[in-house]
Amino acid sequence: MSANGTGDGASAALRQSAARRKFWGWGLEGEGLAAGEIGQLGAVFTERLGIDSVRAQEPPRVEELDLHAPRLVPPASLELVFSTDPYDRAAHTYGRSFRDLVRAFRRDYAHAPDLVAFPRGEDELVSVLDWCCDTGVAAIPFGGGSSVVGGVEPDVGDGYRGVVSVDLRHLAGVLEVDGTSRAARIAAGTLGPALEAQLKPHGLTLRHFPQSFEWSTLGGWIATRSGGHYATLHTHIDEFVESVRVVTPRG
């Protein structure tokens, strides 16, 4: 890791913790254009594109969604790890591509996960994966949900009894810093701003800033071999990785 100065990730990390994320798109609930601004933007489209009118569509609300009933019942030992809350299930249905946004605005949540797991440590994560393997359930890791290629979408076909989205938000943080070698041990569920904010007191930065930086995680970057700003040559995420400890369904 570079010892160069960092941007102010602390303010973004604080902002992220202060409100709930939109389940259907980027950002936090309450953020976005006001009704008047949307009207002005529609007028610009009408004038520039030569179309008769533009109709603004309201974003979906959780209570409007027709989610299928969960097909799975978690074991009593993991009951506190799993959620069937409609917001949680909706928020783990799509990534953030334009196709995902269109389907969300159409209120199409036919493939919502049956359960969302929020493991609070490695032991619980292992238990979740063991249960999924033993019961024929698909497990999909979920970091920031910023995928634009369907990576987090729980559409797995008919070969499984159901789908669990495994949210890694609690497996987060800079766990250890070695100032001499300028290396750090960082949990997979750490969002970009939090990662930078926790490295900054050590005079370090990962210097990896994909467009999804604010709402994507280190684990997701590594899994997808992420690139981004400053990634012209030797600054893709795999250039920064010395070793990885991974929990898989096989150990």
What residues fall within each predicted segment?
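Noncatalytic alpha-helical scaffold of FAD-dependent oxidoreductases
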Residues: 1-250
